[in-house]
Amino acid sequence: MAKGIRDKVVILGAGCSKFGERWDAEPADLMAEAFEECLADAGIEKNQIQAAWQSTGIDAFSVGPGAMPLSIALRLPYIPVTRLENYCASGTEAFRAATYAVASGACDIALAMGFEKLKDTGYGGLPQRSRGVT
């Protein structure tokens, strides 16, 4: 008998875009690159995904509003896509939400994707007020 989440959820696959100063790559290109690698690693088709979570650390930088950038870039079928924003913990939040969705039985296959493209923004770190500086 299952005692916890670890008995109800598995990670089917993972993917990552290439690191580096990729000035020529749009955010959608990087998301699609990681997604294709993830699908290949998992051995599934994108139409098997039943829900998705997109995470980004800070809304103000290059990704776009809401969860539409993920849905459009990956050409996901008509599934619920939720956007999460929680600074450096954003990826963990997306992973946790997808894990709980599967563990609860709300879906069988869920996608969690974290994304940032800060090099194009000139962003140099956390805003001053989040570091306690006034």
Predicted region positions:
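Conserved "HGTGT" condensation-loop signature of ketosynthase/thiolase-family condensing enzymes
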Residues: M1-T82, A103-S104, A112-T134
